């Protein structure tokens, strides 16, 4: 099992020290969330809570994920970084490819691109991007960005984007792509790529998604070998819980270790101490 420390809702100044600690303590990676802005009033309900309200308070930090990854890549040696999740369709494909590719180059093979199609229509509008057909645009953007990340000249013609013969440097190492979401559409998109990222979910519900992904991969003649299943679990607290998850095919856990010990108001020192305790309590070294 690989453990990723989530940086969601952290103060930006804490992330560097959390990353250094995670690197030293043997965590596999860090999860880096993405929001450009936080609007005071929304008509669009948040899809992952029963009441449609956002999980975060106003004035929560949302640092740019690629600037953040570039910074922490330079102060760590083995830690991986995954976006949880980035919304390509809210940007233009060339700026997105440049930012992602540069961060991947600096991370030297330690970047994992987690993507979603988004839920907040108002944020798309503010960014000058259409909300409708964002799923199809996301698929095409991924194809275009993969072409831009290859060495040499490339050109592209699609339904939404076209590119004359061009090149983009620096050329990054291979970037695995994981897709977030709980719907069948999101799972199918994940099955076509390199992995799936879940939301806050029980182990039983996560296992249902794993079984569905296995079916979808089999339909395409693909195995689950080297396919990443990465999710937070709301009811996993012990080594036995994580062993059950791993036996089902879940191979990555997103967690905030300090939440098990000192809670959401933890100081930076308490967060790092919680990471040490969690490492010991779940037998991170096996």
Each model region followed by its residue ranges:
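Active-site-adjacent structural elements that line small-molecule/cofactor binding pockets in enzymes
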Residues: 1-286
């Amino acid at each position: 099992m690989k453990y990723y420390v989530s940086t969601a809702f952290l103060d930006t100044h804490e992330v560097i020290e959390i990353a250094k600690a995670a690197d030293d303590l043997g965590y596999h990676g860090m999860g880096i969330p993405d929001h450009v802005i936080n609007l005071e009033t929304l008509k669009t309900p948040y899809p992952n809570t029963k009441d449609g309200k956002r999980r975060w308070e106003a004035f929560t930090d949302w640092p740019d994920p690629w600037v953040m990854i570039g910074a922490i890549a330079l102060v760590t040696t083995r830690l991986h970084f995954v976006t949880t999740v980035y919304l390509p369709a809210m940007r233009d494909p060339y700026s997105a490819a440049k930012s992602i590719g540069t961060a991947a180059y600096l991370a030297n093979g330690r970047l994992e691109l987690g993507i979603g199609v988004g839920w907040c229509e108002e944020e798309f509008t503010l960014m000058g991007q259409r909300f409708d057909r964002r799923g199809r645009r996301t698929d095409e953007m991924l194809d275009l960005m993969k072409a831009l990340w290859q060495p040499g000249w490339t050109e592209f013609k699609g339904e939404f984007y076209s590119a004359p013969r061009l090149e983009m440097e620096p050329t990054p190492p291979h970037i695995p792509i994981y897709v977030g979401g709980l719907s069948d559409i999101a799972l199918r998109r994940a099955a076509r790529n390199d992995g799936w990222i879940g939301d806050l979910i029980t182990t039983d519900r996560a296992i249902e998604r794993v079984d569905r992904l296995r079916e979808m991969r089999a339909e395409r003649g693909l195995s689950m070998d080297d396919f990443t299943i990465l999710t937070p679990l709301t009811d996993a607290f012990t080594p036995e819980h994580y062993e059950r998850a791993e036996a089902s095919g879940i191979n990555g856990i997103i967690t905030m270790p300090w939440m098990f010990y000192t809670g959401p108001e933890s100081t930076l020192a308490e967060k790092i101490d919680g990471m040490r305790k969690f490492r010991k309590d779940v037998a991170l070294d096996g």
